[in-house]
Amino acid sequence: MLTRIQKIFDAMEQQSVAYVFSGDAISKTADQHFPFQVNKNFFYLTHLNLHQSVLVLIKHKKEDVMLFVPVRTKEKEKWEGILPNFEQIQQETQLSDIRDKATFEAFQTSLFTTLRDATYGELKHVYLDVARPERSCLEEVTFSHELKTNYPELHIHALSHVFKTLRTIKTDDEIQTIKEAINITHQGLNRLVKTLQDNKEEHRLHASFLYELHKNQAKEAFDTIIASGKHATILHYVDNNDHIEQNALVLCDLGAQKNQYNADITRTYPSSGVFTERQKQLYQLVLEVNQEMIEWIKPGKSFKDFKEVGKQLLAEKALKIGLIKTPEDISQYYYHGLGHHLGLDVHDPCDYDMVLQEGMVLTVEPGIYIEEEGIGIRIEDDILVTNTGSINLSEAIPKTIDAIESLFK
């Protein structure tokens, strides 16, 4: 954690302070909240899944780090549970200066008044982790507005570009955690296929996948898509409540989240256990693009080219089978990007102008969607960029026609 914090310091000007907020649970009703989702940049620096917290970095004559965390009263613990104490947080984060969040406002006032000269000297620059300012309900956005109003002389900078650079390259520990999430996803798909053999309801397949996640103390990485027949032509179909027709294809786009890191896998299954000839033709087309683009990935290649080359491959193969008449027609049947970075976020932040580098984790997810035939096919894998090429982290999850049909035997 300290190495990551040091990289934030390295990106900061002298006489500056940076704030990274953990976020808070959003109210659902008078006495309920939606599940808390920690700010992944805060987690990246602290490894804490803790609400209402603030990491503060001050760069002046020396570099100071302090972490403000909530402290619950005994009465509140009876309702909401026990939070980690300062000693436990110190052990987890390797940070020594842990403070009660209740003191943050007074601390903040002291930074930008005459008292600052005695402690830190004049501070001229403020760095904020505010990537989406339109979400004005978030504490950090409100905080940003107050700073601009009360201290207009300050130079305010965004940290988002720094986190993009840092989080794009995964450490060995991060890669291992992503592998764990993929393995749980694989187990969930195995159970889902067994369920599909006897139950032709989308919601039953979803339930079987959720069971495996809960069994492994994992969460859904995103809203699971179980889309059969014509629903598979809708990219973000999440109703998962229709009957699955005989000889339909079932597109399953899903993933487990383990210790905040995500898997993102898509497999497409024949509801009867056997592909029809037309389904085989289209499925093989998508599979070949998936496989060829995984082979295409190497350090030094452009992420923009990755998307464009994949689209061109789809068009070439669609032309050969007569699905389209011109390469431009592919947009009628393929209308999303070929992939994205994966990590703490399912769509991990990145600089799209960066070339591929060792340690990046990408998805490769070509698809074909033919509304008039009620067919949607997508095949998605999670790929690690190595020093010489790539490794398919989800290779163990069956995806060839023979391998998928064997699952039903």
Enumerate the predicted regions with their spans.
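Active-site neighborhoods and metal-handling regions in enzymes and metal-associated proteins
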Residues: 1-409
